[in-house]
């Protein structure tokens, strides 16, 4: 088990910022293998304003985005760019997305991603999001990496 990674360190691993950062903390990872992170879901999330008034539910596509961000963190922890460069991960595809549980304010979403394969600049991962021991969402994710100048 590795030390946890807080939000300030996450900001060095992802380009996302408020209101679109969907990973609050990494609680465990092993480079080139897996990563476990959490997203604390609060009523303050801007998407709850319209999804849905009086019955706030986290949109499924944002659960997928949270998994994609977790996979980007794992990829960035797993290899280093050249001096003066950084990696940007583009969401390139998704397969087998399934939604099993609604996510509401007060839930803590546990994001688990596992590296399935990596070839050159393409990363394949399987992601699952849980609330407690209940599976909320799962998907197979594909991302493409581009090395960009800082």
Curated annotation (Swiss-Prot):
GO terms for cellular component: cytoplasm; membrane. CDD domains: FabZ. The active site is at residue 51. Keywords: Cytoplasm, Lipid A biosynthesis, Lipid biosynthesis, Lipid metabolism, Lyase. The keyword Repeat does not apply. The keyword Lipid biosynthesis applies. Its main location: cytoplasm. It holds the Pfam family FabA. It comes from the Bacteria. GO terms for molecular function: (3R)-hydroxyacyl-[acyl-carrier-protein] dehydratase activity. It catalyses: a (3R)-hydroxyacyl-[ACP] = a (2E)-enoyl-[ACP] + H2O. InterPro entries: FabA_FabZ, FabZ, HotDog_dom_sf. It is an enzyme of class 4 (lyase). Disulfide bonds: none annotated. Its EC number is 4.2.1.59. It is found in: Cytoplasm. GO terms for biological process: fatty acid biosynthetic process; lipid A biosynthetic process. Belongs to the thioester dehydratase family. FabZ subfamily. Involved in unsaturated fatty acids biosynthesis. Catalyzes the dehydration of short chain beta-hydroxyacyl-ACPs and long chain saturated and unsaturated beta-hydroxyacyl-ACPs. This is 3-hydroxyacyl-[acyl-carrier-protein] dehydratase FabZ. It comes from Legionella pneumophila (strain Lens). The lineage of its organism: Bacteria, Pseudomonadati, Pseudomonadota, Gammaproteobacteria, Legionellales. The gene is fabZ.
